[in-house]
Amino acid sequence: SIRYALEKLGHPLADDVDLDWTIGPPLKGSLARLLNSQSDELAEQALAAYRERFAVIGLFENQVYPNVAETLCKLKQQDYQLFLATAKPTVYAKQILVHFELDQYFTEIHGSELTGERTNKADLIAYILEQEQLNAQHCVMVGDRQYDIVGARAHGIDTIAVSYGYGTPEELAQAQPITQINQFNELIECIEQLNQQRKVS
């Protein structure tokens, strides 16, 4: 969808350009960087073009990582409340989770607004804590990018990094999560250990 947007604006990308880094941070800023432009208007045009394709096709060009559904199911059975915190617009995030039948495991799905509010992960987490009346000391953030880890830590939330996502090892190490998992099903044991540590302290 990014390639579609830039091509539509007359700024096609070479096939070998890596776009993995665009997953995680606010998309409008990433588009501006790819366009090498300070123009807010141009970035908005690119964002609109991106959504043209993403809303119809790009939404479903995903694959669920192994063990995700089973792990989410077990966590829900153990009475954990699960909230999604994504920089994607909420309307798209909900469609994606419904498509992959993962929505059933989440208490609520929180993302950004199409108008641009809450694309910053720390702002989004603050919003979720307030809306859901959550105690940050009782929460855990699981993420694969520095934005997840740093955004959660800004609110005193313990963080678990996922090594197999879009964040590089260097990026995740610099973000300083409390621990890291290499497979999603390791999350259950990881949370159990964290709960034990919290009881001790």
Pin down the residues of each PLM region:
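N-terminal helical cap/lid subdomain that shapes the substrate entry/recognition surface
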Residues: S1-A69
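Conserved H-loop
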Residues: P12, D103-T107, N135
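A short, structured active-site edge motif that brings together acidic residues
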Residues: T22, D103-R118
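Short, acidic loop-to-helix structural element flanking the phosphoryl-transfer center
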Residues: V56-L84, T90-K94, A122
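Acidic, Mg2+-coordinating phosphoryl-transfer loop and its flanking beta/alpha structural elements
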Residues: M141-T179
